[in-house]
């Protein structure tokens, strides 16, 4: 019996909606990365984009555990000498684009390269509860029920 190899034309992508309110960012990002890559499917093939389309709402209400909210730093370089910049997770979450915390967490869990970039285009993250993808009829995935560690205990 030969090994099954998924062909790009045979891929069936579903739309999944995840509400990030109260969920831990790292655990959420890990689950999203697996869904984007298609590793939850029996037809997973490493070189084919057979993951699902993922919509994340309420990204601004996702939580970080421990002291990551104040201590975690995101670095980037401008390209100029001495151009290293940093911003804390708190500054990003309280800033204009709080959804970037989840986007960066997922981006760093997906392989770097042409396939990883294509898979990241299947991720849509929104800070609020509104999204323009009602026509796709996404199925709701309740991440909090999958494992009680996925939510922050008070």
UniProtKB/Swiss-Prot annotation:
SUPFAM superfamilies linked to this entry: Ribosomal protein L13
Top-level taxon: Bacteria
GO molecular function, a single term: mRNA binding
GO cellular component terms, semicolon-separated: cytosolic large ribosomal subunit
BP GO annotations: negative regulation of translation; translation
The keyword Membrane belongs to this UniProt entry's keyword annotation: no
CDD domains: Ribosomal_L13
Signal peptide: none
Keywords annotated in UniProt: Ribonucleoprotein, Ribosomal protein
Summary of subunit composition and partner proteins: Part of the 50S ribosomal subunit.
Role summary: This protein is one of the early assembly proteins of the 50S ribosomal subunit, although it is not seen to bind rRNA by itself. It is important during the early stages of 50S assembly.
Database matches in HAMAP family: Ribosomal_uL13 (MF_01366)
Family in the record: Belongs to the universal ribosomal protein uL13 family.
Protein name (Swiss-Prot/TrEMBL): Large ribosomal subunit protein uL13
């Amino acid at each position: 019996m030969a090994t099954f190899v998924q062909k790009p034309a045979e891929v069936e992508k579903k739309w999944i909606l995840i509400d990030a309110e109260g969920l831990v960012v790292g655990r959420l990002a890990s689950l999203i990365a697996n869904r984007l890559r298609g590793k939850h499917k029996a037809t997973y093939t490493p070189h084919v984009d057979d993951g699902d389309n993922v919509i994340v709402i309420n990204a601004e209400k996702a939580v970080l555990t421990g002291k990551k909210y104040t201590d975690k730093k995101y670095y980037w370089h401008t390209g100029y000498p001495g151009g290293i910049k940093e911003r804390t997770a708190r500054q990003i979450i309280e800033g204009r684009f709080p959804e970037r915390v989840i986007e960066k967490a997922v981006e760093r869990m997906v392989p770097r390269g042409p396939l990883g970039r294509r898979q990241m285009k299947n991720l849509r993250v929104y800070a609020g509860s509104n999204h323009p993808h009602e026509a796709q009829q996404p199925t709701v995935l309740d991440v909090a029920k999958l494992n009680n560690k996925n939510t922050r205990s008070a």
